[in-house]
Structure formats: C-alpha cells, structure tokens
C-alpha cells in the first residue's frame, strides 16, 4: 500500500472534477427527488396492500 501514490491519484481526480452548473444540479436534484417519491409510493402501496390482506384474514 503506497500512500503517496494513492494520494496523488486522489488529487488528480479532484483536479479533474468540476462543480456542476446550476442547470445540471437542478436536473440531478429533480431526478433524485422523483426517484425518492417513486420508491416511497411503491412502499406505501405495498403497505396498503399488506394491510388489506391482514384485515381480511
């Protein structure tokens, strides 16, 4: 494990990385938010279905 070699690789990646523009950040935030809402809706539907099945039994 060569620490200086790993640190140089990390610094190289950080030098190449750039901050996203506002439009790019906004698009990523919208997509991530939609994904979170979709997963939450699926979980809520499963909760409702399982609650209905348990109440019938």
From Swiss-Prot:
Subunit structure: Component of the Sec protein translocase complex. Heterotrimer consisting of SecY (alpha), SecG (beta) and SecE (gamma) subunits. The heterotrimers can form oligomers, although 1 heterotrimer is thought to be able to translocate proteins. Interacts with the ribosome. May interact with SecDF, and other proteins may be involved.
Domain of life: Archaea
Protein's membrane topology: Single-pass membrane protein
Location in the cell: Cell membrane
The protein's name: Protein translocase subunit SecE
GO cellular component entries: plasma membrane
UniProt similarity note: Belongs to the SecE/SEC61-gamma family.
Regions crossing the membrane: 34-54
Alphabetically ordered keywords of this record: Cell membrane, Membrane, Protein transport, Translocation, Transmembrane, Transmembrane helix, Transport
InterPro entries documented for this protein: Prot_translocase_SecE_dom_sf, Translocase_Sec61-g, Translocase_SecE/Sec61-g
Principal cellular location given in the protein's record: membrane
Biological process per Gene Ontology, one example term: protein secretion
Role, per record: Essential subunit of the Sec protein translocation channel SecYEG. Clamps together the 2 halves of SecY. May contact the channel plug during translocation.
Gene name tied to this protein: secE
